[in-house]
Amino acid sequence: MAEEEKTELPSAKKIQKAREEGNVPKSMEVVGVLGLLAGLISIFVFFIWWVDGFSEMYRHVLKDFSLDFSKESVQELFNQLAKDTFLLLLPILIILVVVAFLSNVLQFGWLFAPKVIEPKFSKINPINGVKNLFSLKKLLDGSLITLKVFLAFFLGFFIFSLFLGELNHAALLNLQGQLLWFKNKALWLISSLLFLFFVLAFIDLAIKRRQYTNSLKMTKQEVKDEYKQQEGNPEIKAKIRQMMLKNATNKMMQEIPKANVVVTNPTHYAVALKFDEEHPVPVVVAKGTDYLAIRIKGIAREHDIEIIENKTLARELYRDVKLNAAIPEELFEAVAIVFAQVAKLEQERQKQKIIKPL
């Protein structure tokens, strides 16, 4: 039997399971370009501080070398240089780590997936490694890198060619003017390349998300199986609902003998009302249409409960009043008329009982 094609979008459950396994749509191009931007901004912000710091280190080196040139002093000097260099570069390292973390959070949200670090044979299986090496995903990644290098080279060459026409003019400027000219052109080149890298990064992110969705697609049978797992077998649920409805109906039928009157349509609706000391307002103890209406009337006859025909009231009671709920105020008058009819019929019945022996 041929394998069924995966045409259905992944369910929320499958996406959540993939997230728990650390499988999320992620573009390293986005991480890289945001890191590059953060690095350039950091260089601009910390440049003067670094110049002062490295200048102080240089003066310190010259001073120590002039005083002592022993092995111990050289070792101590290099240790101090390494420490000072690390402290000078620490801010940008922290910034790059934070930006890398946030760039991942922006792509797929907060995620803690311990399963990622669990050992799996598939991760070290050389056959799987070879398959992944020649997969469509790797081909697209390689194509994007090639395109990125080509476009960056072309853009850089194009901008540099524009600068060539200004070199003669720049050569006539003083040193300060030349430095300013070089700074402006460098900013232009860097801004252009950053814009290109941002565009390519978001293209890569769109591709990664599409690949991710396609990799999680499901067959129609998988969708059905998952629905059964989450919601239960529809056939079993239908049987359970049927049994619950049957039990509720049987319980309702047991309340009919306690009713005072049944209001009918006369054929399609039947509503049983109860009115006693415990219920100062009449309560609907049973209601139904068609077959249920016939059953309600049948039980009412068996227990000598009056059946009053009132088409409008029967429909309103069935439609507007829930089971075991008191009737609303707007129906008080109509229901009172019905109970008056019941009382009148009861009086007539009592009179007939008294007259019969005579």
From Swiss-Prot:
Gene Ontology cellular component list: plasma membrane
Family the entry assigns: Belongs to the type III secretion exporter family.
GO biological process, one term: protein secretion
Topological type in the membrane: Multi-pass membrane protein
One matching Pfam family: Bac_export_2
UniProt xrefs under Gene3D superfamilies: 6.10.250.2080, secretion proteins EscU (3.40.1690.10)
Record-annotated membrane-spanning stretches: 31-51, 86-106, 144-164, 187-207, 323-343
Keywords: Bacterial flagellum biogenesis, Bacterial flagellum protein export, Cell inner membrane, Cell membrane, Membrane, Protein transport, Transmembrane, Transmembrane helix, Transport
Function: Required for formation of the rod structure in the basal body of the flagellar apparatus. Together with FliI and FliH, may constitute the export apparatus of flagellin.
NCBIfam families reported in the protein's UniProt record: flhB
Protein name per the record: Flagellar biosynthetic protein FlhB
InterPro entries linked to this entry: FlhB, T3SS_substrate_exporter, T3SS_substrate_exporter_C
Gene name as annotated: flhB
Source organism of the structure: Helicobacter pylori (strain ATCC 700392 / 26695)
Compartments, record wording: Cell inner membrane
Source taxon at top rank: Bacteria
